[in-house]
């Protein structure tokens, strides 16, 4: 039961609300430069002619011209048509509100005695503005409670705007009702083939088919596609990432080519480990070559097609070829690495037992690598990795089943054998009471650490990117808002840091450099080159003899001369007939100990020169 006291309080509340609403309607100043003029017409993007309440009377002033308003509307229409929801784009209220907010209806008043005229704009009601921003789900992008920048008064009044018209002999407290249009389904909704920069318009009738061709649409009902490279970074930052990929591809390619040439062509005593290394290094070389092919084709930007509208897919020869090469030899390289780990452990564990499984594992590795590489090709699933710079297997399902899971298993098995190798070395050295265990094991430790840790990072980053795809590409609206307010080239979508993607690229392309450091920078490689035809030919001998003659001349007749060659060191004292000392190299042509095991890359030291190798003769 409502008492008289309740009625009294209710009446007071109504009075308070009414008083609040009246006092919230602030008085707007009259701009003396304001005037009414006809609508200048639609642009390519903005179609307001059918949505304005009065196209013959649009408010303009020195601070707000129709051209300025049309530029702003072009941006908002572009955003609306590009990423607006279906219900937002299909409602006439959206366009009526948007057009009338920036092309305000104009009312003019004239003093008949002085013929002075003033013009004032009719603003959109705040409730209408809130309804539209909620309908279009852009409350975070547009605040209906904001103030106008010039007079710092509400852009959208609650009910009406108050003006002082005493200047033209009118009401000093004139109330101009705000504009609140009603949705009208009979009004034709505009259709345009325009997309705001940097989005690109594609005339698509089948989004699913076009997505298979490499396009990525900003929404299911828009023909605007995301540009490539994806604006995760600025163009300058993308260029730095491209340079990193190109440089590492070349370095890895050159490094592995050096190893193949040194240990399989120049090397006069090739052993089983050289042959095994050649299979592994050859696979890494081909992995790196895929990046070099892209470089010579124009760099990673050559994988971007149609002016940045789409990425390369299996139909593009460069993409399918480099993707197939990278997948094929990545699988082969890791399988050869596992076999190398096993054979190294077996030789150290069972020194007297011979093992020859090449006729089994080489065909097996070739078959597995081909199968895992042909499946993506047959299912049309090679494409450029969006937000990256090479082509590879598409879809998470295929990546996991054909690469990540097999690779993880193989890496783990290889790591176990490397661990056993380190254990055996430690056991043997400890049994002989010799120090320097860490020095002996350092290359094995680096081998497992570098390869395994880079794999872990690649694995984690790949899954992170797959999980972030919806988040990254769901920020087109905020990205576009940035382009409205700033230089578009400096606007980016919030995604993985440039450092994390840069390290991902580093891990993919660095394996050839790893191989060169671990295998190519040692005494054995130096000695192979030293004894090769490049340093043992007439031209080099001529240069060496001339240098020695110069050195001999510089010492004078009473001096001491020392001559060093690849095999013999001779020291001669010319006075008093002192004995001369000849030291034959432990690696001379006829040295019986110079066998295959001396060149075993997994031996930790060469045979030492003993006293029996030293001959003392009379000069």
From Swiss-Prot:
It is a multi-pass membrane protein. Disulfide bonds join 36-106, 48-99. One of its GO terms (molecular function) is transmembrane signaling receptor activity. The chain crosses the membrane at residues 246-266, 279-299, 322-342, 359-379, 403-423, 445-465, 498-518. Residues 31-169 form the FZ domain. It comes from the Eukaryota. Glycans are attached at residues 4, 63, 112, 143, 159, 184, 203. It is found in: Membrane. Residues 581-605 are annotated as: Disordered. SUPFAM superfamilies: Family A G protein-coupled receptor-like. The keyword Phosphoprotein does not apply. Residues 1-24 form the signal peptide. One of its GO terms (cellular component) is membrane. Keywords: Disulfide bond, Glycoprotein, Membrane, Receptor, Signal, Transmembrane, Transmembrane helix. Residues 267-278, 343-358, 424-444, 519-619 are cytoplasmic. Residues 25-245, 300-321, 380-402, 466-497 are extracellular. GO terms for biological process: cell surface receptor signaling pathway. Belongs to the G-protein coupled receptor Fz/Smo family. This is Frizzled and smoothened-like protein L. It comes from Dictyostelium discoideum. The lineage of its organism: Eukaryota, Amoebozoa, Evosea, Eumycetozoa, Dictyostelia.
